[in-house]
Swiss-Prot record:
Converts 2C-methyl-D-erythritol 2,4-cyclodiphosphate (ME-2,4cPP) into 1-hydroxy-2-methyl-2-(E)-butenyl 4-diphosphate. Pathway: Isoprenoid biosynthesis; isopentenyl diphosphate biosynthesis via DXP pathway; isopentenyl diphosphate from 1-deoxy-D-xylulose 5-phosphate: step 5/6. It is an enzyme of class 1 (oxidoreductase). This is 4-hydroxy-3-methylbut-2-en-1-yl diphosphate synthase (flavodoxin). The lineage of its organism: Bacteria, Pseudomonadati, Pseudomonadota, Gammaproteobacteria, Alteromonadales. Gene3D superfamilies: Dihydropteroate synthase-like (3.20.20.20), Sulfite Reductase Hemoprotein, domain 1 (3.30.413.10). Binds 1 [4Fe-4S] cluster.
Length: 371
């Protein structure tokens, strides 16, 4: 597979969220946010584990009350991946979750009280080596900025972000990342472009309130893809009105499409037409379902006829080209003598893909796959 990647990442400082490096060339981290009641510890822990199982690097948890902070303590004790506490208005909640081992605080320094309260949170974060995310959102800009700009604009988002950055700068705190999210793609993209020129800290990307699973995925892919292709972004969240697990899957698919970071199988499949020799759509859907557990990066082409099939197979780890009654099978671009019965394609291909993943991971000798 042609894999030249012309993207030059924006230079930034590095912070750590738990043991996950962010910025300075580190792999772009994919995160999501729980949508359970935080006080429902069992449900929240279960969702965090589900997110971990599909590859989430970091999970954010809303902590709106002191009761939620006490629940967070229990949640943190049962979680294996770094957790960010999302906090607004009450600085005491930030101090409390810091005691309980939070890995990052998502706050806006300007909305948690006066300078003394801000200082107490920042000093606590410094003492406990906890980074902060400044999270600016087009839907919650300060009143004076709305009066000045009349509506959310890239310049308004930038000005809001720089206010909060300046607060941390005055307190000599540099362990932070920043986001300037908006629900409009062009608004968010331009705000991030402006911010990327102003600061050296890592940037967390997101198109906020993007929509449902389909429309939100498309909007996020367009917006985040534009920024990532320009080298902007160190961590991301795809915000969907859907199961948070889908956010992680879409996030990795975006990174995979740009060949920035790969996890699991990259399926190359034709949309099918009357030339197809087997049911391509049902085959791909079933294989995606069966092979969700595979994290090994690999390219698998599934093409229903010989027009494009051999060409795609030549640049795939595993390739399938439709043929009458039996379909051709390629391994590392080499056509194999073995052919698959079209009535048993899914089972046959699943076995080959799993064997290939084991070879790539070094668990079985290469010659064993085609015996």
């Amino acid at each position: 597979m042609y894999s030249e990647n012309p993207i030059k990442r924006r230079a930034s400082t590095r912070i750590y969220v738990g043991d996950v490096p962010i910025g300075d060339g580190a792999p772009i981290a994919v995160q999501s946010m729980t949508n359970t009641l935080t006080t429902d510890v069992d449900a929240t822990v279960a969702q965090i584990r589900a997110l971990e199982n599909v590859g989430a690097d970091i999970v954010r948890v809303s902590v709106p009350t002191m009761d939620a902070a006490e629940a967070f303590k229990l949640i943190k004790q049962q979680s294996n991946i770094p957790l960010i506490a999302d906090i607004h208005f009450d600085y005491r909640i930030a101090l409390k979750v810091a005691e309980y081992g939070v890995d990052c605080l998502r706050i806006n320094p300007g909305n948690i009280g006066n300078e003394e309260r801000i200082r107490s949170v920042v000093e606590c974060a410094r003492d406990k080596n906890i980074p902060i995310r400044i999270g600016i959102n087009g839907g919650s800009l300060e009143k004076d900025l709305m009066d000045k700009y009349k509506e959310p604009t890239p310049e308004a988002l930038l000005e809001s972000a720089m206010r909060h950055v300046d607060i941390l700068d005055r307190l000599n705190f540099d362990q932070f990342k920043v986001s300037v999210k908006a629900s409009d793609v062009f608004l968010a993209v331009e705000a991030y472009r402006l911010l990327a020129k102003q600061i050296v800290q890592p940037l967390h990307l997101g198109i906020t309130e993007a929509g449902g699973a389909r429309s939100g995925s498309v909007k996020s892919a367009v917006g985040l893809g534009m920024l990532l292709a320009e080298g902007i972004g160190d961590t991301l969240r795809v915000s969907l009105a859907a199961d948070p697990v889908e956010e992680i899957k879409v996030g990795f698919d975006i990174l995979k499409s740009l060949r920035i970071r790969s996890r699991g199988i990259n399926f190359i499949a034709c949309p099918s037409c009357s030339r197809q020799e087997f049911d391509v759509i049902s085959t791909v859907n079933e294989l995606e379902r069966r092979l969700e557990d595979i994290v090994t990066p690999m390219d698998v082409s599934i093409i229903g006829c010989v027009v494009n099939g051999p060409g795609e197979a030549l640049v795939s780890d595993i390739g399938l080209t439709g043929g009458a009654r039996k379909s051709g099978y390629f391994d590392d671009g080499v056509r194999q003598k073995e052919r698959f019965d079209n009535d048993n394609i899914v089972d046959s291909l699943e076995a080959k893909i799993r064997a290939k993943a084991s070879i790539i991971n070094g668990r079985i000798p290469a010659q064993d796959i085609n015996k």
